[in-house]
């Protein structure tokens, strides 16, 4: 199985939104909908145009199996957003590949720090971030 990490492409917009909502609602039972996440409606404006980036992990069938976003806060700080990996694709190092892409991009752009926020329900995410050097 090959997983490719690609830059966001508008043709994936609806699949991206459904992918993230499905994980939030079905897996973590978070009461959230599309209107609560306006950043997903316009990735170009909310991520790309401000110096950030958004990547997708794509499987052999060209379906999204992971996401990660990077918002540029100022010249040397950024924030990690919307990191999700499909439950059936976890433990395949996809999250690590996505996070490595963010870290490499930050180094290339001389970004000194990456903020991230998570919630108590994302226990495995907290463990993952801690194991990858986040405090």
Regions found by a protein language model. Name each.
Residues 3, 7-81, 86-87, 99-101, ...:
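Acetyl-CoA-dependent GNAT
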Residues 90, 107, 130:
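Short polybasic/polar patches that bind polyanions
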Residues 96, 120-135:
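Conserved active-site alpha-helix within GNAT-family acetyltransferase domains
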Residues 86-92, 120-121:
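Active-site acidic-Proline motif in GNAT/NAT acetyltransferases
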Residues 93, 110, 133:
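Short glycine-rich hinge loops at helix-strand junctions in the catalytic core
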Residues 6, 71, 90, 123, ...:
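Nucleotide phosphate-binding site architecture
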């Amino acid at each position: 199985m090959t997983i490719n990490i690609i830059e966001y492409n508008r043709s994936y917009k609806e699949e991206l939104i459904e992918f993230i909502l499905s994980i939030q609602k079905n897996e973590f039972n978070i009461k959230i909908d599309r209107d609560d996440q306006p950043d997903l409606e316009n990735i170009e404006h909310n991520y790309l145009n401000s110096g950030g980036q958004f990547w997708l992990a794509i499987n052999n069938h060209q379906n999204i199996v992971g996401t990660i976003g990077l918002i540029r806060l100022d010249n040397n700080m950024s924030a990690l957003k919307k990191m999700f990996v499909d439950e059936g694709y976890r433990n395949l190092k996809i999250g690590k590949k996505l996070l490595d892409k963010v870290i490499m991009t930050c180094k290339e752009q001389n970004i000194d720090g990456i903020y991230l926020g998570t919630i108590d329900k994302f226990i495995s995410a907290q463990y993952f971030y801690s194991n990858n050097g986040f405090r």
